[in-house]
Amino acid sequence: MSKPIIFLLTAFVVLTDLGATEDTEKVEVKAKPSKTSRGAIGQGFELHKIDLLSKELQGTGAQVFEELPVEECTTDNKLGTIQKDDTFYSNTESLYNSVASNSKIEPSLKGPFTLGTSVGAVTNNIVSEKSEIQGLSLNLKAYSMIHALKQDCINKKPLAKDLVSDFEALDREVKKPWLKPSWRKYKVFLEKFGTHIVRETMSGSSIYQYVFAKSSESFKQRDFKIKACLSLGGPTQVGKLGISACSDVSKKDVEESSGKEMVKKLVVRGGKSDTRVDLTGELSKNQINKFLKEATTDPSPIQYTFYPVWTILKARYIGKEHYAKATNLEQFYKGYLNFDCAYEKSEKGLELQKFELAEDSDPDAPTYVCKLGPEGCHSDDDCESDDLIYCACCGDSCIRYNNTVLLSTGDTKKVAFINDVDDEFRDHGCGRKGLKCKCKEENKKWGQSWSGDSDADAALRDINAMMLDQNRRDQAKRHHVKKGKSLH
C-alpha cells in the first residue's frame, strides 16, 4: 500500500484594523484538559451553515474518523492569558478577513456563502454585497488551553466506515455538471459528514461586544468605540469597566452617542454556563473579571480552526481510482457553491453561466471552470445603428460582461448579462452590411470567471498520475502472474 501523502496547510495572515492592545495578564490555569475543553475537535461540520462567532459548537458534529484516541492524537497546551483589546472593521471585507483568519479558513472561502451565517449573526444581517458596513468589537478574552489534532492522525487514522462507503459510492464522472441535480450525491455527502473538521479548539472564556452600522452613516472609529463601551457597561459603568478603550468616555460622549443608531450584539462564550446566563444587558467590572477568571478552572471552547474534508480524502486516495471523487467534492464546493456558478440562462434560452470541466481536465483528477456565454451579438436582431458609421450590440441575445466588486472579499467577479438597454455597446460582432447593421462576426469563444486549477493542484495531479500509473502497472502484473498460474 502506498504511503499517505501529508498535506501541509500554509499559514496566512490577513490584516484587520486592530485597535490598541491592552494589558495582558498572566494567570495560572488549574483546569486539566477534558472532553469539555476540547469540544468538537475532530468532528465534521458544514461550515456555511454554522455560526462561528456567537454560538458554541456542540459536540454533535459528524463522525469523520472511526476513532481518535485522545492521548495519541491531540496536543494540549496551557496558555493562561487574559487579554483585552478592540478591533475596528473599516469595511465589510475586513470583517470577513477577521473571521477567515481566526478560523484558519483559506482565503478563497472567505465570502458570503461560507462565512455569511457567521457574519450575519453579529451584524443582524445588515451585511450585503450592495452596501458597505463598518464596526468595532471590544474583545475580552481569557485563554486557558489550546487543543490540536495531530496531522499524523488526520492522515492515518481509519476513517468512519460509513464515510468510506458513501464516498466510494459517489459518481467518478459527473455528467452535466452545470445542473445542480447532477451533484445530488455529493451534496448529500457534505450534508452528512460536513465540509470541514474542527482541527483546533481554544478554550477559556470570552466576552465580545460588537457594534455595526452601514458605512453610509459616516461614523468615525471613535463613535463605534464609544457605542461599544456604552453597550457593554451602560452610561454609569462605562468608565469603570477596567478597559482602557472605555476609560476616556465622557458625559458629552454619552449624550452624543444616544442619537447614533447602530446594531449591537453581545457574545459570551466559555466559562461556566450558569455565569453565562447572568451576563446579559449592562455588565460591571466585577462580573467581567469573575467570568474571565473562570477560564482557569472551567474552560470551554471559545474559538475554533478548521480543516477541509476533501483535503483528508485527497491524502487518503491519492494514486487510487477514487481520487477523482475527492477533487470533484472540492471543486463542487469551491466553484459551484462558494463561487456561485449556478447554471444561468436568459429568457430566450441563451446560456449565460455554466459550471463545466476544463478543456484540459484530467479524468483522474478533474478540474472545473465557471464559463460565461460568448460575449457579443448572436443574432442580426442584436445589432442596431449607433450612428452613420458604427453599429452597437443591443438585443435579446447580446451578451455583455461586467466586473462586479465583491464587498466581502475586495475581489471582482466577472458576470454575463443580456445587454438590451445600452445602445452604445459598439461592435462586438456587429458591423455594417450595406446600410444595415448585422451580426457579421459572431463570437463563439466562451469566457471564464473562475478556475479550479492552481499550481498546488497541478503538482498533486502529477503525483496522482505517477502513483496511479504505477498502481495500474502493478495490478496488471499481478493479474498476468495469476493468469499464468491458472494455465498451469
From Swiss-Prot:
PROSITE patterns: MACPF_2 (PS51412). One of its GO terms (molecular function) is toxin activity. Residues 369-398 form the EGF-like domain. GO terms for cellular component: extracellular region; nematocyst. The keyword Electron transport does not apply. One of its GO terms (biological process) is killing of cells of another organism. Residues 1-21 form the signal peptide. Residues 24-344 form the MACPF domain. Its main location: secreted. Disulfide bonds join C370-C383, C377-C391, C393-C398. Keywords: Cytolysis, Disulfide bond, Hemolysis, Nematocyst, Secreted, Signal, Toxin. Causes lethal toxicity to the shrimp Palaemon paucidence, and hemolytic activity toward sheep red blood cells. This is DELTA-alicitoxin-Pse2b. It comes from Phyllodiscus semoni (Night anemone).
